């Protein structure tokens, strides 16, 4: 935590990139290192993010036929008292997208959830149990909230000792 290197060694920070104390989604290592939602760390996705993805990311694992039709999305998060916009191909949902709260940040509730869609996610394994899943947050101090195994929002770091899943979205 709070470290970075100049020799190419990765120091994965769940909340932000490198030693920058900025918890906005735009600066979250997960966007680049795991999701491949952008191909420039800490920056907006470029037009080649989907067609020339960062190696060993979720984006690179998607079929090329899907990646070629994917479209970027403008994502809104909160940092240091202001709205931060980022351009992403595989973002995580925000609590407002699911529960309809905090719409002042331009995050809208998706019709699927507005119409009663499930907020519980299941493990992709033989027991198919209900699991925690990560969301973008609008907090100044963390980059993630989670949905608990009960389908309810849990804010902040209480969950950091639990294993959580991710359920990114994309647009075609």
What is the meaning of each model-derived region?
Residues 1-172:
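Collagenous Gly-X-Y triple-helix signature in extracellular proteins
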